[in-house]
A protein has these predicted regions:
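Helix-to-loop junction immediately C-terminal to a conserved catalytic motif
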Residues: 60
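Conserved ABC transporter NBD signature motif
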Residues: 68-82
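Conserved ABC ATPase "signature" region
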Residues: 120-139
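Conserved ABC ATPase signature
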Residues: 143-147, 151
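Conserved catalytic motifs of ABC-family nucleotide-binding domains
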Residues: 164
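Catalytic Walker B motif of ABC-type/P-loop ATPase nucleotide-binding domains
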Residues: 168-172
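ABC ATPase nucleotide-binding domains
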Residues: 234, 240-282
Length: 282
């Protein structure tokens, strides 16, 4: 499999050193050293409960590490860091939610993502630009409760991009979306990567993004492996990681991981070896 692009050789936007995470009495994993460069796309894979989302929460300053350190753009990670954008899993808002699409995006622009807005000069122009950028300008005045899941997720991405973040954390952002919306959301995220943002993308299904991925962090059973997709998505590597037989199978243009204990779904790949992504670097 060929990679669509290569991460630029620049100082790390994310530095994790000697990190360990614990949930109650159970250690999720330990000894993680990770650098993410500007413009790098890192996929985080593994079964439910392996600590993928908890890792994102730690980077966001919401979950303390049990050991180690996290630095974002050279500074210790902390809650409310506006150098970080966060795209959550798509969860439909209640149909009676009356907030306009514009107002949801504005929460990322006006100085707070919670509580009352703090208007600033130029906010409306910035919101308009974000709505246009995520393809949501034509429903900016509609109540979000009346929008489809894909339309709502575009707004969440717009909110995450409000401060032009240097690091973009994505937690299962394609879950529950149809193929067209998966491609649209992935394209928006990749555009931010092309502008220099590092991307951490948690997913159970690597298929929609594998053509963009530079490296994979695969976490399972309190252990992890880090490398390129070609290095990680191998039967031998995943069998060693899980401690039981796991098979990476090719079926035409698809790559499927089977036999992984407690994994939700499979990882499929529809990117042929001689195919390049439409927005790939030369």
């Amino acid at each position: 499999m060929s990679r669509a692009h290569h991460a630029p050789e620049r100082a790390s936007i994310l530095e994790i050193r000697g990190a360990a995470l614990q949930r109650g009495d159970r250690e999720l994993w330990s000894g993680l050293d990770l650098d993410v460069a500007p413009g790098e796309f890192l996929a985080v894979l593994g079964p439910s409960g392996s600590g993928k989302t908890t890792l994102l929460r730690s980077i966001l300053g919401l979950q303390p590490l049990s050991a180690g350190s996290i630095r974002v753009d050279g500074r210790t990670a902390q809650r409310g860091d506006r150098r970080i954008g966060y795209v959550p899993q798509q969860r439909p808002l209640a149909p009676d939610t009356s907030m306009r699409a514009r107002d949801l995006v504005a929460l990322g622009v006006n100085g707070t993502r919670f509580g009352f807005p703090l208007p600033r000069r130029g906010d409306r122009e910035r919101v308009d630009a974000l709505l246009e950028g995520v393809g949501a300008a034509h429903y900016a005045e509609r109540p979000v409760g009346l929008l489809s899941g894909g339309e709502q997720q575009r707004l969440r991405v717009g909110q995450a991009l409000a401060d032009d973040p240097a690091l973009l954390l994505c937690d299962e952002p394609l879950s529950g979306l149809d193929l067209a919306n998966q491609r649209a959301i992935t394209g928006i995220i990749d555009r931010q990567r092309k502008q220099g943002a590092g991307v951490l993308f948690v997913t159970h299904d690597v298929n929609p993004i594998l053509g963009l991925v530079d490296r994979i962090l695969y976490i399972a059973g309190g252990r992890f492996v880090l490398g390129t997709p070609d290095e990680v998505l191998q039967s031998r590597v995943l069998t060693e990681l899980y401690g039981t037989a796991v098979f990476v199978l090719r079926a035409g243009d698809r790559l499927v991981v089977v036999g992984a204990p407690d994994a939700e779904g499979t990882h499929a790949h529809e990117h042929s070896a001689d195919e390049s992504h439409p927005g790939a670097h030369a």
